[in-house]
């Protein structure tokens, strides 16, 4: 539900800004997202990475979150393509639900807005 809500928030922003051609590529986990983006980097102008990591009782949360973020940043800089980071890192499920709520401040939508901003889709909105 959390990932689906992040996707919904992102898709809503894309459609609102008349982006009609986009693909949704699913990943088995957060750690695999940079690899999946790297395999598809030449096929798209930009990417929006979405997902959720909820902290457990081991340091695994920290390693996975950092690895995914570092991988995404490396791909962004190395390929000169924007990748919006909508991977939310939360302390519990309630926090994750709040940050992915489509009726509130959905982090998937925010990641989509960031990518569109970098691509220049908001030029007219700033006047």
Regions of interest found by a model, annotated:
Residues 23-39:
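N-terminal beta-loop-helix "entrance" segment that forms/cooperates
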Residues 35-72:
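Glycine-rich phosphate-binding loop
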Residues 62-89:
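Short, acidic/small-residue loops that bind anionic groups at enzyme active sites
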Residues 91-106:
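Phosphate-binding/catalytic loops
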Residues 105-127:
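A charged, well-structured terminal subsegment
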């Amino acid at each position: 539900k959390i990932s689906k809500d992040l996707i919904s928030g992102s898709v809503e922003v894309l459609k609102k800004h008349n982006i009609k051609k986009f693909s949704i590529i699913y990943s088995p986990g957060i750690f695999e997202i940079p690899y999946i983006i790297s395999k598809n980097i030449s096929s798209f102008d930009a990417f929006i990475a979405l997902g959720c990591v909820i902290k457990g009782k081991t340091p695994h949360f920290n390693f996975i979150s950092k690895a995914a973020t570092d991988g995404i940043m490396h791909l962004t800089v190395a390929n000169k393509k924007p990748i919006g980071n909508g991977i939310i890192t939360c302390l519990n499920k309630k926090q994750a639900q709040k940050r992915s709520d489509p009726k509130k401040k959905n982090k998937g939508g925010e990641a989509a807005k960031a990518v569109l901003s970098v691509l220049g889709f908001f030029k007219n909105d700033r006047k």
